[in-house]
Every structure is written in C-alpha cells, then in structure tokens.
Swiss-Prot record:
Belongs to the purine-cytosine permease (2.A.39) family. Transport of uracil. The modification Phosphothreonine is found at residue 572. Gene3D superfamilies: Hydantoin permease. It is a multi-pass membrane protein. One of its GO terms (biological process) is nucleobase transport. CDD domains: SLC-NCS1sbd_NRT1-like. The chain crosses the membrane at residues 62-82, 88-108, 143-163, 185-205, 212-232, 252-272, 292-312, 342-362, 384-404, 407-427, 461-481, 496-516. Keywords: Membrane, Phosphoprotein, Transmembrane, Transmembrane helix, Transport. GO terms for cellular component: endoplasmic reticulum; fungal-type vacuole; Golgi membrane; plasma membrane; plasma membrane raft. InterPro entries: NCS1, Pur-cyt_permease, Uracil/uridine/allantoin_perm. It is found in: Membrane. This is Uracil permease.
Amino acid sequence: MESVDNNSFFSRIRNSNAYRKVKDFVILDHRPGMTMAERMLTNKDLYPVPPSKRLWGPWNFISFWLADAVNINTWMISATAIELGLNWWEAWICVWVGYLICGILVATTGRPGAVYHISFPVLSRSSFGTWGSLWPILNRSVLACVWYGVQAWIGGECVVLMIRSIWPSFSHIPNTMAKSGTETYQWVGFFIFWLLSNIAIWFPVHQIRHLFTFKAIVAPPAAIAFLIWALVKAHGAGPVIHEPTKLGQYEHAWVVINGIVTCIDGFATLIVNNPDFARFATTPGAVHWPQIITVPLAFGVTSLIGVLVSSASKAIYGTTLWDPTQLLASFLDHSNAHGVRAGVFFIAFGLCIAQLGVNIAANSVSAGNDLSALLPTVINVRRGGYIASIIALCMCPWNLLSSNNNFTTYLSSYSVFLSSFAGVIIADYYFVRKGLIRVAPLYSSSSSSPYYFWKGINFRAFASYICGMLINIVGMAGSTGQKVPKVANTMFNLNYFLGITVACLSHIIICKIFPVTECGEKMLSEVPEEADDYLLTLASEDSIDKDSTSEIYIDGLPTEKEVEKDDVLSITSKKLSGCFP
C-alpha cells in the first residue's frame, strides 16, 4: 500500500507544471525520434556550423591572434630563458621559432574544423572513436577549467591596479580573508574580473569575434604605451639587453631548445582546440596563412616589449620585474601623481581586456565545447562556459599560484598529454584518412559507423596516445621535483616534440598494420560538402515532421526560422548550381 502511495506521489510530481518547467529548462531540445545513445552524441552546439554562421574571415583570425598575443604570459615568456643564461636576443629568437611552429600547428589542426565546420569534440570521434573521444575531451575540459581560474586570478590583478589608480587606499582595506590565503582587495579584483568574464560567456562564438576585434584595438596600444613610458622613465632600455650569454656550448644548446619548447607548451591547449574557432571560417584558406604569419609576428613583438619593459624596470628599481602588473604596482607605490595614476589605469585596462580575451578563447570556449560533448542532453556551450566559470571560482586559484605550490609546474607539464592527442588527430586526418571525413556517422551510435570501431573505441588511437605519453612521463615527474635519471630530464626539454612525433608516427604505423575504413585515395581528399549535406538532411527530416519543434541550434541560441530557411536555401542553391549550364 505504501509503495502505491509513493508511486502516486512521484506521479503527481512528474505531472505538475513546476516539474515540467524545470525539465524543459534543464533538458536541452533534441530532434524527435532519437535514441538516448544518439542524444548523447548531439545537441544544438555540436552540429556543423550552418552557412549563415560561418563569419570568420582572414581578418577575423588576424585580429584574433593580434589580440590573443597581448597577454601577461606572453609578456613574460622570455624570462625563463634569460634567467637560465641566454642573452635577450637569443631568447627572442627562441620565441620566434617557437611561435612559428605554433602557427603551423594551429593551422594544421584548424583545417579539419574549417573544412567540415565541426568542433574538436566531434573531430576527435573520427580518430578516437564515437565513445573513445570522451577521454581526450575529458582531459582537455579539466585542464581548461583549471586554467580558467588561473587566468582569471591574473586578470583580477589588472582590476586591482585599475581600482588602486582611482582609490589609492584600496590595497589597504582590512583583510578579512587571511585564513583563505589571500588579501581581501585581491579577491575583490578577482571577483570583478570573474563577473565580467561571465558577461562574455553569454555570447555565442560566432559573435565574440567582436570582442577580439575590440581587444586588438585596445591591448596593443596599451602595451606600446607601457613600453614608451618605461623606456622614458629608465632613460633607455636598461641593463638586461646588454647582458651576455652565461652558458657553455652544451648547456647553451639545451636552454635554446627549452626556450622554444616552452612557447609551444604554453600553446598546447590552443593547438588542440583550434577547430572550435576554425569551424566558423568562411573558407578553409582563412585559417592558413593568417595564423601561420600572425602568430609568430604578434607573439614575438609582445615578448620583445616584455623584455624591454622588464629591462627598464631594473634600471628604475634595481631589480628585474618580469610581471607587468608588479611593475605597474611599483609605479603606484612610488608616486601618487594624477598622471601616473591615469597612465596605470589605462594600461591596466588594456591588460585586463587582454586577459579577458585570452581566457575566453583558450579556456571558456574550449571548456564549453568539451562539457557540451560530455553531457550533450543538458549542457550546451554557454552552460559549459558557466560551469567552467563556477569551477574556477570554487577551486580558489590564489592557492594554486602560491609560491610554495608546484601546481603551476604540473599545469605546464600537462602539455605532454595534449601533444599526444594532437599527434593522433593530425596523423589520423592527414596521413591515415587523407582528409576524408564522413560527417553524418560522427553523430551516429550505430555499430555500422566507420568511427564506431570496437564498442565505440579506436584501440589504434589509444595505443598511439599512450606511446606519445609514456616517452615523456618520467621527465614530467622530474620536472615536478622527483628524482629521475638525468637522461629523462634532458629528454623532457623536447617534451612537446617527442609527444606529438611519437604519437603521430605510432598512429601511422599501427593503422598500416590494422587499416581503418573510409580513407581518401590521395592527400587531402576532402569533401567539404559533407557538412552541408548533413545539415540539408536534418532540415529535410524536420520539414517532414510537421509536429516537430526541433531546429538546428548553434552556440546555445536558437536560430530564427527565417535564418534556418536561408541556410537550407543557400545549401540547396549551392548543390543545384552545378546542375545547370
């Protein structure tokens, strides 16, 4: 009798208006007739980008990287190499070489997204398998959430400088958070930056290109103004640029290699998640030279400004301040003049926008795409971005960045895992499948799908990934302070190169021994129409189902029916245009 009452109670809850409203809000819309397995592979944000949303042209990618280059990490990228003994121009050459390689790699990983208009989570299904792709997606989503918090804390330091410029006493407010390991004024700056980031997360990816355009207008002039101010204040470039190399020939070579790899390690996330942006490209060519040229140019100039400003800081204060926020804080500590405060405010504002842009690009968007792919029935890109934001707030990033914490070393070393993922994806797309991807099967849970492999897992990709990871794992332990053989530490100087090369070659060899299906006959046997054909099929099925309210959604925002109709018509006209003389 009690069981009947319980069933009746739960039945009343399920039939209540409140329950239905909550369910309708939490559960994302899906196309009718889909099985639960199919719903776990699709949602509005995972579909290929329709023509009306392919708005990123070459200049958008150029402005994206011009904006992304101006950030505090890039500003300080040469510091390690110089402190290890290189002179400034040797460290700068390392930066140019490192970021040139990064530009080539992001163009390489971005091309599949630009051709088929699919994100990294969907692309990884073609190499790791329908369900096996969840492993690289999970890895990258965790890393993106952690880095989101770290970058937000750095952005908060810029906000603190802006507030101090207006109210100099702000840094002296009572500390009510001593037990939390931080100062109240620092936490307030972090929280304000965190709130501002949440506004940017609301907008879909095809629209936030305007944020990067704004950042490209604001951040570089702020960096140049900072450089001029520091050089004038120091009456020159300072002593750092006159310091000679302090290394022997053998050590010199390895420090140069380490300087190059350090740049690539910091780019590891962007190399993997470039399809998340490239999918919005107007043409595949928009992701090639604009990225290959702009990345080393923009990041090289930013690092040079960082070296010159830091060198000037030594002439001004007797110590080299590599962190620009510390130097700006020193300006405020030594002068209360209105001109100094105004200058610090506007430069800090530029750096704040720079940090906001890099956090959205490298962490928020990638976390949103990844979390959306992990649980597509309830998470879209927007919700995923907000989940990452909440995780970042809860993990107390100030503790992770404390001087006695090795966590930042672990974060930097994590690139050995991402390099293996990149190696497998590059090998699979360019050398195994030769650019041929069937888009529709990427969203199918059927065992007949060419990407289902064994129970949805491609053992070839995982074997290759493990090979690329294992060659670096001992050196990674050494980088965190563990005792390991000297040769492992030496090899770890090549960590990204080793990881991506071993994973790439292993995948090519294994796929030669155990061939996969659906491969092109020659290099770049791409079929760009695959994405449009799949979208056209979805639109046709929806039009047949008269009662369906299902639509194709992009970036968490439903497209208007008129826009959807234009998308279908543009696809149809493209297909029909070849049928008439």
